[in-house]
């Protein structure tokens, strides 16, 4: 009689356990039955943590922090799609793909505190009410300090505050803290990656200061709105910033640019893209050197290291 009762009791127990799990708000599908030593044991199946990012800076930093972990990082937009076009992308042709990615995603990394129009989290939330927002510029819960914003800065994506090593380090801190809470088993590796990243930034800062001490002329003019944080972090002398499009550089404006460069003995003119030949000629006529720096690269830490190195080399040609 006993052999018959035991399987029946086991079946009833399993049914009761499933009901109890449902009452407790747990999904019975997330558990599997393991039978060992004559007993049935419930083991929760492990779900891989999935994180979405769409901007070069958020995806790039997340990739560095999550290297060597089992956290699944998904690029939610094409790598070459500018942030300014992501609103139309996620609400248009990219909507089906984001809907699919978001359905089982745990978090979306964005920059809404810096760029209010950042569409990733709001649009992803339409497909998954449980998805968590990670704001890389300022923690949603205020648990850590956010990035330092320059007074009077219009901000948005163009200002690129992460071109400052201090700000990039703060962004990495914010992201690592949230990612470690989302994936506790990956936290030791995330923390190790964070420490290595910040060590690179500290080394960059120390070496930059020592190298710039040898420069005779630290005056620069920027023809881009992307480098205010970079030149400020290096304590350079910014004579002017004029980010007008090439089409707006009239002959009179070009003459005025050349005169300003000469009058202020400007050493370097910065741009994030190749300017027109007319602008190049005006810079040369003003006695300055044009330097085109990179933005929105795949590896933001390496990009910052390269930009700083190129800028210092241009300012210290004889060292």
At which residue positions do the language-model features occur?
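Extracytoplasmic metal-acquisition and chelation regions
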Residues: 22-319
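Positively charged n-region of N-terminal signal peptides that target proteins for export
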Residues: 1-7
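Bacterial N-terminal signal peptides
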Residues: 7-19
